[in-house]
Each structure stands twice: as C-alpha cells, then as structure tokens.
UniProtKB/Swiss-Prot annotation:
UniProt source species: Bacteroides fragilis (strain ATCC 25285 / DSM 2151 / CCUG 4856 / JCM 11019 / LMG 10263 / NCTC 9343 / Onslow / VPI 2553 / EN-2)
Family (UniProt): Belongs to the chorismate synthase family.
Taxonomic superkingdom: Bacteria
Protein name, per record: Chorismate synthase
Alphabetically ordered keywords of this record: Amino-acid biosynthesis, Aromatic amino acid biosynthesis, FAD, Flavoprotein, FMN, Lyase, NADP
UniProt-listed Enzyme Commission number(s): 4.2.3.5
InterPro entries reported in the protein's UniProt record: Chorismate_synth, Chorismate_synth_AroC_sf, Chorismate_synthase_CS
GO molecular function, one term: FMN binding
Subunit organization: Homotetramer.
GO cellular component: cytosol
Cofactor: FMNH2
Length: 358
C-alpha cells in the first residue's frame, strides 16, 4: 500500500535497489505535452550515482525506457509506463546484513511490519526508489513549463556551513557549476571540502536544501486538509533521510512580531502583490502568486563505515561494520529529487484547481 503519490496527476512506483529495475506508472498526465526525453534523461543524470568524489561510487547509467503513453513525441493522456534497469548491483556487499539490523535504517521496522525484508541495499527502502520520482518530476516540469512555472533547488547548508542570505541574494544559474549544487562558489568549496573530509573518516553528514517555485498562479491549494504547504511538506518528508520542512520564514519568524511578519498588500499597476514575502507565497493554504520557497533538512546518511553496536534478528547484542558504496552526504543528489516532488505536487494541485469552478 501507499506506493502511489498524487490525486489527479498520480505516480505509482515499483522496484528495489538490487532488483531488476526501478519503474513507475503515471496516470492523469495531460495529453498533448511535448515529451523531451533528453531532458528527462538529464534530470536522471543529476540524481544518478558516481557523479563526483563526494557521492557514492556505484556506477549506473540510469537510462529510462518509456513503455507507454507517448506517441510521436507527445503524451497521449493514457498511463505513461517507464522503467530504469539496474546494472551495477554488488549484492554480496550486503551479505553481512542479512541477520543484523543497521542502526537508524529501515531494517528493523520493515522486518517487524512485514515479517520479511530484502537486505540487499535496503530493498524498497533504498533511495534508489527516487528514480521513479525524478522521472515523474521531469515530466511534470515539462507540463509546468507551458504554464510559466519553474522550480529550482540548491544546497544551502552542509553541517555547520550555511548560506546566510535569502535565495534572492544569489545567482541561481551557478547551482550546477559545482558538485555540491550551491549558488555561492566560496561556500560550495567549503562544503565540498567538508564532505570529502567526512567521507575519508568513513562518516556522513547532513544539511539543508532550499527550493524556490516561480510563476505559480494564485489559487492553488485545497483547504482545509489539502493546504498547499501541507502537500509540499508531505511530499518532501516522504523523501529518504528528510527530517524537517519549513516554508517562508519558518521558525525564524517566531522572533518577530505580527506587525513585522505581515506581508502587506499593494496595487502594482493593477496587480495585487505583497511588499514582503514572509509567508513564502502561501496564505491560508493557498498560493498567493508570489514566489513559493521552502527548506528541507536531511539527516546524515545512516550507513557509516565504522563499527557500531546493534542486535541481530534474535535480539542478541553484536557489532556491525558496513561495507559497500554509499553517499557521505545526500544533499547534492537530493536536489533533483526535491525539485521533482515539488513539480509533481504543483502540477497535481494545478489540475485539482481546474475543478474548483465551472
């Protein structure tokens, strides 16, 4: 259950980290959208492993194969099926995990819940599942482009190293110029050096991604239980290793008074706008036409290459030292995943909004 995401635009994903492949079926995608398969592949390449010295060394082409729902380069309105074949599994790296539980992983909870688990690379709980999300998000981005909606995410903090400014203070075109995907070149170098150092110690580190949605029309959101920020929060917190979500000023706004936090309205040549955007583009659970921006915190990767205490499947105390190929920090590869989940959420809520009035 619960392997599907969305209401009208709906992605159902399938597959495991060391199975034959990862795939999905997308229902509710509008007909007539030009499908740029090269763009979809580029998005997957941003997520794939082995991009740099600060990511996992697992080598996968992650080539997407579309199976249905596209004809002569356009969506038909029928379900879009796709698959990405796994090619570089090293399942033997996980033989020592068959009868022990990795600290802070899903091993124990999956075993208790289902009575069985795939110990090879985490199985269904692996972040490799997010391949399906990136494909779905890439298709959603293609549709949103036609509406003038654009989504950009970037690394804004790694461990103690953080960007102090708002997204408006940076040139977001610089995000893809460094492996950390940070728009501040100096901070990016510091972040990269820290990740590399942590990797050398066999440890991991977390941080924060910031995401900005520009061009979102007024009116997206379905109060009271389908508020737009709640939907975005649900989408982000469904990503592996995501631990917290805040939009607008978030917790920072608690330090101010209401008179300081309020986004006052004014008439800008016939268009009602706000002079500030503390609300993060959402008021009353509905988009107000301003930029939507939010932050997602990711914990350090649970797999560390050092000995740790744990228990085996019989509940007996033991120790475990992980092997295999793992990310020392998820943030660089999580950037396209955050964008994908945001894109699918916005497209879904755009389609829902078309049902609000006759």
């Amino acid at each position: 259950m619960f392997n599907s995401f969305g209401n009208i635009f709906r992605l159902t994903s399938f597959g495991e980290s060391h199975g034959k492949g990862i795939g999905g079926v997308i229902d509710g995608f509008p007909a007539g959208i030009v499908i740029d398969e090269e763009f979809v592949q580029q998005e997957l390449s941003r997520r794939r492993p082995g991009q740099s010295v600060i990511t996992t060394s697992r080598k996968e082409a992650d080539k997407v194969e579309f199976l249905s729902g596209i004809f002569e380069g356009k969506s038909t309105g029928c379900p879009i099926g796709f698959i990405v074949w796994n090619e570089n599994q090293h399942s033997n790296d996980y033989n020592n995990l068959e009868k022990v539980y990795r600290p802070s992983h899903a091993d124990y909870t999956y075993t208790v819940k289902y009575g069985i688990r795939d110990h090879r690379g985490g199985g269904r709980s692996s972040a490799r599942e997010t391949i399906s999300r990136v494909v779905g998000g890439a298709l959603a981005k293609l549709a949103l482009r036609q509406l003038g909606i654009h989504i950009t995410a970037y690394t804004s903090q790694v461990g103690p190293i953080k960007l102090e400014g708002n997204y408006t203070d940076y040139d977001l075109d610089l995000i893809e110029t460094n492996p950390v995907r940070c728009p501040d070149p100096e901070k990016a170098k510091e972040m990269q050096d820290l990740i590399y150092k942590i990797k050398g110690e066999g440890d991991t580190i977390g941080g924060v991604l910031t995401c900005v949605i520009k061009g979102c029309p007024i009116g997206l959101g379905q109060p009271v239980y389908g508020k737009l920020h709640a939907a975005l929060g649900n989408a982000m917190l469904s990503i592996n290793a995501a631990k917290a979500f805040e939009y607008g000023d978030g917790f920072k706004g608690l330090k101010q008074k209401g008179s300081e936090q309020n986004d006052v309205f004014y008439n800008n040549n016939g268009r009602i706008e706000t002079r500030t955007n503390h609300s993060g583009g959402i008021q009353g659970g509905i988009s107000n036409g301003q930029d939507i921006f939010f932050r997602v915190a990711f914990k350090p990767v649970a797999t560390v290459l050092m000995e740790q205490e744990t228990v085996n499947i019989d509940g007996i105390d033991t120790t475990l030292k992980a092997r295999g190929r793992h990310d020392p920090c998820v943030l660089p590869r999580a950037v396209p995943i955050v964008e994908a989940m945001a894109a699918m959420t916005i497209l879904d809520y755009y389609l829902l909004d078309r049902m609000t009035q006759l």
